């Protein structure tokens, strides 16, 4: 299996399966001198973890990070950082009935067609368990970005089924299990998810990520576009079926006079571009959004085929999320941060000595944003 590494100057490789003995990652290219301790990973891993809410999978993993290399006396050395998390709460017997069946909407069929073999236990390599290591690597990237450039990357749930936020406050997001930006709606979300779980069905969601403080100039034209690499990174997350940058697909119905982000000495008057023009950061907040499909792991019967091509009925047992989007904000944050750190290192390598050619336009006066 190839394509387990992404990034150029900052390269991240993940390994391991959902029900294997461990999962891990190697971060290559992190500059030396960054203070790093194993306990720093706990916060974001808890945010991503299952079993902390009745609205997510009941699987409970300790997610304790072991730093195997790349850190000496509490600081990164510039050599590859190897991180390991041991799996402790696998329940492989739940998957005994689907060893020879293909679950509709899962990677069972495509992995079988590509490799001629698959690990049916929890989805193996295709499981969202792999994203644990993305979040772990993202902790390193977010810390480096904040310390070096003051960049802050934050995510939130922007839609659950047909429900959208009726207000927005960053302070509310970490105070509920949905990463929801409007506290008054949380009881309604709880009731919605309780009913969904009882029905045995699942639902999709949208997640938004905002990166603030990104300097103008990060990114590359044509084949190394910042928005292109963000889109690729976010599309690599399990269940993601769409990515928007700024106004995204809403741009299709806008007039040019609506979409263009006018500039004044005080800053940009809007941010429909989502902070990126020509593949290069403008200095405004970078705004991205992803759509996640409903999980196909359902206890409702459905038609499928087995490895012999025979028609069968499938019912997925085990512990599964009724909405995978609920745990996705920390994962999306991590992918955005890793792309930004890689782009920052590449920009510094090529254009670190380039001075300002013209006055740098401030972020803007906040009259309009990509969601208007």
UniProtKB/Swiss-Prot annotation:
It catalyses: 5-O-(1-carboxyvinyl)-3-phosphoshikimate = chorismate + phosphate. Pfam families: Chorismate_synt. Its EC number is 4.2.3.5. GO terms for biological process: amino acid biosynthetic process; aromatic amino acid family biosynthetic process; chorismate biosynthetic process. InterPro entries: Chorismate_synth, Chorismate_synth_AroC_sf, Chorismate_synthase_CS. Gene3D superfamilies: Chorismate synthase AroC (3.60.150.10). Reduced FMN (FMNH(2)). Its cofactor is FMNH2. GO terms for molecular function: chorismate synthase activity; FMN binding. Keywords: Amino-acid biosynthesis, Aromatic amino acid biosynthesis, FAD, Flavoprotein, FMN, Lyase, NADP. Pathway: Metabolic intermediate biosynthesis; chorismate biosynthesis; chorismate from D-erythrose 4-phosphate and phosphoenolpyruvate: step 7/7. FMN binds at residues 125-127, 238-239, 278, 293-297, 319. NCBIfam families: aroC (TIGR00033), PRK05382.1 (NF003793). This reaction introduces a second double bond into the aromatic ring system. PANTHER family: CHORISMATE SYNTHASE. Belongs to the chorismate synthase family. Homotetramer. This is Chorismate synthase. It comes from Xylella fastidiosa (strain M12).
């Amino acid at each position: 299996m190839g394509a387990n590494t992404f990034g150029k100057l900052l390269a991240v490789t993940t390994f391991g399966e959902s029900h294997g003995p461990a999962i891990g990652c190697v971060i290559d290219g992190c500059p030396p001198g960054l203070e790093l301790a194993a306990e720093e990973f706990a916060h974001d891993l808890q945010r991503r973890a299952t079993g902390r809410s009745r609205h997510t999978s009941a699987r409970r993993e300790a997610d304790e990070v072991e730093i195997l290399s790349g850190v000496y006396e509490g600081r990164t050395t510039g050599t590859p950082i190897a991180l390991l998390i041991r799996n402790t709460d696998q329940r492989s017997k739940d998957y005994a009935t689907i060893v020879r069946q293909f679950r509709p909407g899962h990677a069972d069929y495509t992995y079988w067609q590509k490799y001629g073999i698959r690990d049916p236990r929890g989805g193996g390599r295709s499981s969202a368990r792999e994203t644990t290591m993305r979040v772990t690597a993202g902790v390193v990237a977010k810390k480096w970005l904040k310390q070096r450039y003051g960049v802050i990357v934050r995510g939130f749930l922007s839609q659950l089924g047909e429900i959208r936020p009726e207000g927005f406050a960053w302070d509310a997001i970490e105070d509920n299990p949905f990463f929801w930006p409007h506290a008054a709606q949380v009881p309604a979300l709880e009731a919605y998810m309780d009913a969904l779980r009882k029905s045995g069905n699942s639902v999709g969601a949208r997640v938004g990520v905002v990166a603030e403080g990104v300097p103008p100039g990060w990114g590359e034209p044509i084949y190394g576009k910042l928005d292109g690499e963000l889109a690729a990174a976010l599309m690599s997350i399990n269940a993601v079926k769409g990515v928007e940058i700024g106004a995204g697909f809403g741009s299709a119905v806008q007039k040019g006079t609506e979409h263009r982000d006018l500039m004044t000495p005080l800053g940009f008057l809007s941010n429909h571009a989502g902070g990126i023009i020509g593949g290069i950061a403008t200095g405004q907040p970078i705004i991205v959004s992803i759509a996640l499909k409903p999980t196909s792991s359902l206890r409702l019967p459905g038609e499928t085929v087995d490895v012999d091509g025979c028609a069968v009925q499938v019912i997925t047992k085990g512990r599964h999320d009724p909405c995978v989007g609920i745990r996705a904000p920390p994962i999306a944050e991590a992918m955005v941060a890793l792309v930004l750190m890689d782009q920052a290192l590449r920009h510094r390598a090529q254009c670190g000595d380039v001075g300002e050619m013209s006055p740098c336009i401030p972020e803007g006066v906040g009259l309009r944003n990509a969601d208007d």
